[in-house]
């Protein structure tokens, strides 16, 4: 069992929105690893970061991602920083990984004043976002099997583009 697609990208790139729509279009479930982490620990991501630190959060995240890659056969949406873990990057090998690309300006606009993003909290959000992009974009590109520009594209158009590039059998082919 393996996910149909694994979505990666910076905060605001559309992983949750695109994930929901893509899963619906494919007739499969969506597993968001950030939600799975909160369910598993009974704590918010912001609380884990504040209390235990980023390193402990990344350890928990890697465990959740590895389990999801082994057990989930729908669409998998990873937290924006999951690819910073070498173990996660290695585990993604052989999977269909879709990098939802976004510009820094669009990412800052989309994330707005969202307080549930610990690494973007506080002043100078635009600078923090650009720093995250500089660190993570090369990692997203390294693990991606498909790159999709989400700038100035509505979610429906992004999903249609992904569907056109996925190797998805039609219902009649799947029945044979």
Swiss-Prot record:
Q: State its cofactor.
A: Mg(2+)
Please state the Enzyme Commission number of this protein: 2.7.1.71
Pathway where it operates = Metabolic intermediate biosynthesis; chorismate biosynthesis; chorismate from D-erythrose 4-phosphate and phosphoenolpyruvate: step 5/7
Q: Where in the cell is it found?
A: Cytoplasm
Which superkingdom, per the lineage? Answer: Bacteria
- What GO terms fall under cellular component here? cytosol
Miscellaneous note, as given in the UniProt record, is: The phosphoryl transfer proceeds by an in-line associative mechanism. The random sequential binding of shikimate and nucleotide is associated with domain movements that suggest a synergic mechanism by which binding of the first substrate may enhance the affinity for the second substrate. Was identified as a high-confidence drug target.
Q: Which family does it belong to?
A: Belongs to the shikimate kinase family.
**The protein's name in its UniProt record:** Shikimate kinase
């Amino acid at each position: 069992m393996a996910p149909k697609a694994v979505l990666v990208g910076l905060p605001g790139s559309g992983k949750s929105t695109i994930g929901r729509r893509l899963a619906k279009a494919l007739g499969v479930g969506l597993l968001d690893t950030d939600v799975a982490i909160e369910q598993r620990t009974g704590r918010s991501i912001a609380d884990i970061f504040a209390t235990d630190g980023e390193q402990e959060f990344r350890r928990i995240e890697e465990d959740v991602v590895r389990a999801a890659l082994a057990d989930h056969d729908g669409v998998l949406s990873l937290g924006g920083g999951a690819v910073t873990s070498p173990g996660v990057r290695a585990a993604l090998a052989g999977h269909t990984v879709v990098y939802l690309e976004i510009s820094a300006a669009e990412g800052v606009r989309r994330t707005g004043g969202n307080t549930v993003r610990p690494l973007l909290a506080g002043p100078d959000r635009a600078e923090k976002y650009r720093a995250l992009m500089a660190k993570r974009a090369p990692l997203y590109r390294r693990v991606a099997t498909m790159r999709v520009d989400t700038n100035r594209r509505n979610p429906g158009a992004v999903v249609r583009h992904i569907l056109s590039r996925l190797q998805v059998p039609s219902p009649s082919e799947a029945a044979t």
